[in-house]
């Protein structure tokens, strides 16, 4: 298909271990049949996330690109997004029919946000196992992203987290912004996330 305005660019952020790469893989699987999809992963010194996606065979190799950011990972998605913008330009040249590019940030803290120049839509992932108080910390990634994913809710009983209270705190932190309570490895929440991307992203 491909839009005259270029592909929808979806930024995926969140702390290390929250489930960003799992989300990227699930979205590529879920949307790769109906849409022309590509993925850019950001890692500090390796291309480990890109290699994981290649091994999982979620997309053909020519649709996955790993960039090594060096230093602080949020710089490559915010202050100086040139390395990611160059990867997008390369994809658009090679795959002119692209509908969606998922841009996965390197693991960072709750303050990381995407430059509007880089991402049209932002998704932020947090980990239930990181503790009951995460939504109350209200970092910009958590409060300002277009969609928040509270991942690994299946682990709540094992880490002493009350899911009802976690959701109440999430709702309070988000205001009117959307969120999904999910368990991405089990596919829980993925259909809702795909629907959100289609509706809000105009696919």
Curated annotation (Swiss-Prot):
Coiled-coil ranges from the UniProt annotation: none
The keyword Lipid metabolism appears for this protein: no
Molecular function via GO: GTP binding; GTPase activity; nickel cation binding
Subcellular location: Cytoplasm
Pfam families recorded: cobW
Gene Ontology terms: cellular component: cytoplasm
Gene3D superfamilies found in the cross-reference section: P-loop containing nucleotide triphosphate hydrolases
Alphabetic keyword roster: Chaperone, Cytoplasm, GTP-binding, Nickel insertion, Nucleotide-binding
Domain of life assignment: Bacteria
The keyword Zinc is annotated on this UniProt entry: no
Residue sites binding GTP per the record: 14-21
GO BP terms: urea catabolic process
Quaternary structure and interacting proteins, as annotated: Homodimer. UreD, UreF and UreG form a complex that acts as a GTP-hydrolysis-dependent molecular chaperone, activating the urease apoprotein by helping to assemble the nickel containing metallocenter of UreC. The UreE protein probably delivers the nickel.
Function: Facilitates the functional incorporation of the urease nickel metallocenter. This process requires GTP hydrolysis, probably effectuated by UreG.
Family: Belongs to the SIMIBI class G3E GTPase family. UreG subfamily.
The protein's name: Urease accessory protein UreG
Organism: Jannaschia sp. (strain CCS1)
Name of the gene this protein is made from: ureG
